[in-house]
Curated annotation (Swiss-Prot):
Reactions it catalyzes: Hydrolyzes single-stranded DNA or mismatched double-stranded DNA and polynucleotides, releasing free uracil
Residues at the catalytic site: 61
GO molecular function, one term: uracil DNA N-glycosylase activity
NCBIfam families, per the entry: PRK05254.1-1, PRK05254.1-2, PRK05254.1-4, PRK05254.1-5, ung
GO biological process, one term: base-excision repair, AP site formation via deaminated base removal
Cellular compartment(s): Cytoplasm
A cellular component term, taken from the record's GO annotations: cytoplasm
Protein name in UniProt: Uracil-DNA glycosylase
Amino acid sequence: MNSWTDAIGEEKTQPYFQHILQYVHQERLVGKVIYPPQNEVFSAFALTEFKDVKVVILGQDPYHGPNQAHGLSFSVKPGIVPPPSLVNMYKELSQDVGFQIPSHGYLIEWAKQGVLLLNTVLTVEQGKAHSHANIGWETFTDKVIHQLNLHRENLVFLLWGSHAQKKGQFIDRSRHCVLTAPHPSPLSAHRGFLGCRHFSKTNDYLRSHGVEEINWQLPL
Protein backbone atom coordinates (compact mmCIF):
# COMPACT_ATOMS: atom_id res chain seq x y z
CA MET A 1 0.00 0.00 0.00
CA ASN A 2 1.81 3.09 -1.28
CA SER A 3 -0.65 5.85 -2.03
CA TRP A 4 -3.48 7.66 -0.32
CA THR A 5 -5.69 6.35 -3.11
CA ASP A 6 -4.86 2.80 -1.98
CA ALA A 7 -5.28 3.65 1.69
CA ILE A 8 -8.39 5.83 1.76
CA GLY A 9 -9.66 6.06 -1.83
CA GLU A 10 -12.77 4.07 -0.99
CA GLU A 11 -13.85 6.69 1.54
CA LYS A 12 -14.84 8.98 -1.34
CA THR A 13 -17.71 6.65 -2.23
CA GLN A 14 -19.07 6.46 1.33
CA PRO A 15 -22.32 8.32 2.07
CA TYR A 16 -20.79 10.15 5.07
CA PHE A 17 -18.01 11.54 2.86
CA GLN A 18 -20.43 12.60 0.15
CA HIS A 19 -22.38 14.38 2.88
CA ILE A 20 -19.29 16.32 4.02
CA LEU A 21 -18.46 17.53 0.52
CA GLN A 22 -22.08 18.43 -0.15
CA TYR A 23 -22.37 20.34 3.14
CA VAL A 24 -19.18 22.35 2.55
CA HIS A 25 -20.12 23.04 -1.08
CA GLN A 26 -23.56 24.27 -0.01
CA GLU A 27 -22.06 26.55 2.66
CA ARG A 28 -19.76 28.12 0.06
CA LEU A 29 -22.67 28.47 -2.39
CA VAL A 30 -24.78 30.51 0.05
CA GLY A 31 -21.87 32.91 0.49
CA LYS A 32 -20.28 31.74 3.73
CA VAL A 33 -16.50 32.06 3.82
CA ILE A 34 -15.03 28.62 4.44
CA TYR A 35 -11.35 27.94 5.15
CA PRO A 36 -9.15 26.67 3.68
CA PRO A 37 -10.01 27.49 0.04
CA GLN A 38 -11.58 24.57 -1.81
CA ASN A 39 -8.40 23.67 -3.70
CA GLU A 40 -6.38 23.41 -0.45
CA VAL A 41 -8.67 21.31 1.77
CA PHE A 42 -6.65 18.14 1.05
CA SER A 43 -3.19 19.75 0.75
CA ALA A 44 -1.71 17.60 3.54
CA PHE A 45 -2.29 14.50 1.41
CA ALA A 46 -1.06 16.11 -1.81
CA LEU A 47 2.22 17.17 -0.20
CA THR A 48 2.98 14.01 1.82
CA GLU A 49 2.25 10.70 0.09
CA PHE A 50 1.13 7.70 2.19
CA LYS A 51 4.38 5.76 1.67
CA ASP A 52 6.49 8.84 2.52
CA VAL A 53 4.93 9.66 5.91
CA LYS A 54 7.44 9.55 8.78
CA VAL A 55 5.80 11.82 11.35
CA VAL A 56 2.19 12.83 12.01
CA ILE A 57 1.46 16.12 13.78
CA LEU A 58 -2.21 16.18 14.66
CA GLY A 59 -4.05 19.49 14.84
CA GLN A 60 -7.71 20.19 15.57
CA ASP A 61 -9.46 22.35 12.99
CA PRO A 62 -8.10 24.92 10.51
CA TYR A 63 -7.31 28.51 11.47
CA HIS A 64 -10.45 30.60 10.98
CA GLY A 65 -8.91 33.99 10.12
CA PRO A 66 -8.39 35.41 6.61
CA ASN A 67 -5.52 33.95 4.55
CA GLN A 68 -4.25 31.70 7.35
CA ALA A 69 -5.34 28.11 6.66
CA HIS A 70 -4.01 26.28 3.63
CA GLY A 71 -4.60 22.64 4.52
CA LEU A 72 -1.64 21.89 6.82
CA SER A 73 -2.11 21.79 10.59
CA PHE A 74 -0.42 24.67 12.48
CA SER A 75 0.93 26.17 9.22
CA VAL A 76 -0.07 29.56 7.79
CA LYS A 77 0.45 31.01 4.33
CA PRO A 78 3.56 33.10 3.58
CA GLY A 79 3.24 36.71 4.69
CA ILE A 80 0.95 35.85 7.61
CA VAL A 81 2.20 36.38 11.17
CA PRO A 82 2.72 33.02 12.94
CA PRO A 83 -0.20 32.37 15.34
CA PRO A 84 0.47 31.88 19.09
CA SER A 85 0.55 28.04 19.06
CA LEU A 86 3.09 28.05 16.27
CA VAL A 87 5.16 30.69 18.08
CA ASN A 88 5.37 28.26 21.02
CA MET A 89 6.34 25.41 18.68
CA TYR A 90 9.15 27.62 17.37
CA LYS A 91 10.24 28.40 20.96
CA GLU A 92 10.42 24.70 21.76
CA LEU A 93 12.29 23.98 18.52
CA SER A 94 14.86 26.67 19.27
CA GLN A 95 15.53 25.23 22.75
CA ASP A 96 15.39 21.62 21.59
CA VAL A 97 17.30 21.51 18.30
CA GLY A 98 18.93 24.93 17.94
CA PHE A 99 16.25 26.02 15.47
CA GLN A 100 16.52 29.56 14.11
CA ILE A 101 13.10 31.17 14.28
CA PRO A 102 11.83 32.34 10.87
CA SER A 103 9.62 35.37 10.28
CA HIS A 104 6.89 33.24 8.65
CA GLY A 105 4.75 30.26 9.62
CA TYR A 106 4.79 28.31 6.35
CA LEU A 107 5.58 24.67 7.19
CA ILE A 108 5.58 23.22 3.68
CA GLU A 109 9.24 22.13 3.95
CA TRP A 110 8.26 19.77 6.78
CA ALA A 111 5.46 18.29 4.67
CA LYS A 112 7.88 17.64 1.81
CA GLN A 113 10.10 15.62 4.17
CA GLY A 114 7.34 13.30 5.35
CA VAL A 115 5.68 15.23 8.17
CA LEU A 116 1.92 14.78 7.73
CA LEU A 117 0.39 17.97 9.14
CA LEU A 118 -3.12 16.68 9.68
CA ASN A 119 -6.07 18.49 11.21
CA THR A 120 -8.80 16.20 12.53
CA VAL A 121 -11.44 18.48 10.95
CA LEU A 122 -10.53 19.82 7.51
CA THR A 123 -12.78 22.87 7.10
CA VAL A 124 -14.11 25.74 9.22
CA GLU A 125 -16.35 28.77 8.78
CA GLN A 126 -14.63 32.16 9.01
CA GLY A 127 -14.47 33.40 12.60
CA LYS A 128 -16.18 30.31 14.05
CA ALA A 129 -13.83 27.76 15.59
CA HIS A 130 -15.09 24.17 15.49
CA SER A 131 -18.06 25.17 13.30
CA HIS A 132 -17.53 22.06 11.14
CA ALA A 133 -16.69 19.72 14.01
CA ASN A 134 -19.70 17.45 13.57
CA ILE A 135 -20.18 17.13 9.83
CA GLY A 136 -18.20 13.89 9.41
CA TRP A 137 -14.57 14.91 9.06
CA GLU A 138 -13.63 13.05 12.25
CA THR A 139 -14.76 9.76 10.68
CA PHE A 140 -12.52 10.44 7.69
CA THR A 141 -9.43 11.41 9.69
CA ASP A 142 -9.94 8.44 12.04
CA LYS A 143 -9.69 6.25 8.94
CA VAL A 144 -6.50 8.06 7.87
CA ILE A 145 -4.85 7.38 11.24
CA HIS A 146 -6.18 3.81 11.26
CA GLN A 147 -4.61 3.08 7.86
CA LEU A 148 -1.27 4.61 8.84
CA ASN A 149 -1.30 2.63 12.07
CA LEU A 150 -2.08 -0.62 10.25
CA HIS A 151 -0.08 -0.42 7.03
CA ARG A 152 3.03 1.56 8.03
CA GLU A 153 5.54 1.01 10.80
CA ASN A 154 7.95 3.07 12.88
CA LEU A 155 6.02 6.30 12.48
CA VAL A 156 6.15 9.07 15.08
CA PHE A 157 2.80 10.51 16.17
CA LEU A 158 2.96 13.87 17.98
CA LEU A 159 -0.24 14.23 19.98
CA TRP A 160 -0.56 17.59 21.70
CA GLY A 161 -3.58 18.27 23.87
CA SER A 162 -6.44 16.02 24.96
CA HIS A 163 -8.26 16.16 21.62
CA ALA A 164 -5.28 14.75 19.69
CA GLN A 165 -4.50 12.23 22.43
CA LYS A 166 -8.04 10.88 22.41
CA LYS A 167 -7.92 10.67 18.62
CA GLY A 168 -4.71 8.65 18.74
CA GLN A 169 -5.54 6.34 21.62
CA PHE A 170 -5.82 3.24 19.36
CA ILE A 171 -2.36 3.65 17.77
CA ASP A 172 -0.24 0.52 18.28
CA ARG A 173 2.60 1.69 20.50
CA SER A 174 4.59 -1.47 19.83
CA ARG A 175 4.92 -0.53 16.13
CA HIS A 176 4.99 3.25 16.36
CA CYS A 177 6.32 5.99 18.61
CA VAL A 178 3.59 8.08 20.25
CA LEU A 179 4.71 11.28 22.00
CA THR A 180 2.18 13.24 24.04
CA ALA A 181 2.26 16.71 25.61
CA PRO A 182 -0.13 19.56 26.44
CA HIS A 183 -1.20 21.69 23.48
CA PRO A 184 1.24 24.45 22.38
CA SER A 185 -1.51 27.05 22.80
CA PRO A 186 -0.62 29.89 25.22
CA LEU A 187 -3.29 28.49 27.56
CA SER A 188 -1.44 25.23 28.11
CA ALA A 189 2.10 25.37 26.65
CA HIS A 190 3.69 26.13 30.02
CA ARG A 191 2.15 22.97 31.49
CA GLY A 192 4.63 20.74 29.70
CA PHE A 193 4.67 21.45 25.99
CA LEU A 194 7.63 23.79 26.45
CA GLY A 195 10.45 21.46 27.41
CA CYS A 196 8.88 18.32 25.89
CA ARG A 197 11.76 17.94 23.38
CA HIS A 198 9.51 16.14 20.93
CA PHE A 199 11.44 17.32 17.89
CA SER A 200 14.77 15.80 18.95
CA LYS A 201 12.98 12.70 20.31
CA THR A 202 11.33 12.26 16.91
CA ASN A 203 14.70 12.28 15.18
CA ASP A 204 16.23 9.95 17.78
CA TYR A 205 13.46 7.43 17.09
CA LEU A 206 13.68 7.74 13.30
CA ARG A 207 17.45 7.40 13.38
CA SER A 208 17.28 4.31 15.61
CA HIS A 209 15.00 2.68 13.01
CA GLY A 210 17.22 3.54 10.05
CA VAL A 211 14.93 6.30 8.80
CA GLU A 212 16.33 9.63 7.61
CA GLU A 213 15.73 12.37 10.17
CA ILE A 214 13.62 15.47 9.68
CA ASN A 215 15.50 18.72 9.14
CA TRP A 216 13.23 20.93 11.24
CA GLN A 217 14.94 24.16 10.19
CA LEU A 218 12.73 26.25 7.91
CA PRO A 219 13.92 28.87 5.41
CA LEU A 220 14.31 32.15 7.29
